[in-house]
From Swiss-Prot:
The gene is upp. It comes from Xanthomonas axonopodis pv. citri (strain 306). Allosterically activated by GTP. It holds the Pfam family UPRTase. It catalyses: UMP + diphosphate = 5-phospho-alpha-D-ribose 1-diphosphate + uracil. 5-phospho-alpha-D-ribose 1-diphosphate binds at residues 78, 103, 130-138, 199. This is Uracil phosphoribosyltransferase. Pathway: Pyrimidine metabolism; UMP biosynthesis via salvage pathway; UMP from uracil: step 1/1. GO terms for biological process: UMP salvage; uracil salvage.
Length: 210
C-alpha cells in the first residue's frame, strides 16, 4: 500500500500549530483548510493527463489537461467537511460525494447513517477527506461503500494517522493510497490518536466542551 507522509516544511509547521490545545476554533479551521489544499496537491501529483489543442494568443497551442471524468471528493461527516474548502480551492470543478459514519464509542465500529454519491464512480478518482485515521474502521467502511458503487481509484487524505489504522487499511484495501501530514505514535485504550489533535470535529465546529 502506498503511504505518503508529507514532509514539506509548510505542512509540518501547520500540523504543529494544530496540536496546540489553546488554538481557537477560527485558527484551527483555517489551518485545516490550508492543510487540505497542501495535502491534495500531493495526492493529485500522479493524475493522468492528455494533450489538448486550443487557441492561443499567437495561434493554436497544445496544453495538458486532466484526463477522464472529474474527481470526486468524499468528505466523511462531519469532520471531513472541514477539509473540503481547501481541497475545492485546488480542484474547484470536483464533484462532491458525502458519507456519514460515526464511531460507536463502546465497540469502536463505524455505524453508517448517510450516503450520497456522485455517478460514474468507476471513471473517477475518489479522494476521501477525513482529518483523523485512527482505528481505520470508518475509512474501511467508506471504501467498501465506494467500491460497491463502482469506484476503482481511491485515495485518502488525512491530517494525522495512527499506525494501527494504517495496518488495518492495508489488510483490507492494499490498493488505496494514503496521504497524511503525520503518522503519530499509537492509539489509546479509547481508540484516540496520540499525540493527535483532540477531537477534530469538535475543534473545527466549535462544539468541544469548555
Amino acid at each position: 500500500m502506498k503511504i505518503v507522509e508529507v514532509r514539506h516544511p509548510l505542512v509540518q509547521h501547520k500540523i504543529g500549530l494544530l496540536r496546540d490545545a489553546a488554538l481557537s476554533t477560527k485558527g484551527f479551521r483555517e489551518l485545516v483548510t490550508e492543510l487540505g489544499t497542501l495535502l491534495a496537491y500531493e495526492a493529485t501529483a500522479n493524475l493522468d493527463t492528455e494533450s489538448h489543442t486550443q487557441p492561443g494568443w499567437a495561434g493554436p497551442v497544445t496544453v495538458q489537461r486532466i484526463a477522464g471524468a472529474k474527481i470526486t471528493l468524499v468528505p466523511i461527516l462531519r469532520a471531513g467537511l472541514g477539509m473540503l474548502p481547501g481541497v475545492l480551492a485546488l480542484i474547484p470543478a470536483a464533484r462532491v460525494s458525502v458519507v456519514g459514519l460515526q464511531r460507536d464509542e463502546e465497540t469502536l465500529q463505524p455505524v453508517p447513517y448517510f450516503e450520497r454519491l456522485t455517478g460514474r464512480l468507476e471513471e473517477r478518482d475518489a479522494l476521501i477527506l477525513d482529518p483523523m485515521l485512527a482505528t481505520g474502521g470508518t475509512l474501511i467502511a467508506t471504501i467498501d461503500m465506494l467500491k460497491r458503487a463502482g469506484a476503482r481509484r481511491i485515495k485518502g487524505i488525512f491530517l494525522v494517522a495512527a499506525p494501527e489504522g494504517l495496518k488495518a487499511l492495508e489488510a483490507a484495501h492494499p490498493d488505496v493510497e494514503v496521504y497524511t501530514a503525520a503518522i503519530d505514535d499509537h492509539l489509546n485504550d479509547k481508540g484516540y490518536i496520540l499525540p493527535g489533535l483532540g477531537d477534530a470535529g469538535d475543534r473545527i465546529f466549535g462544539t468541544r466542551l469548555e
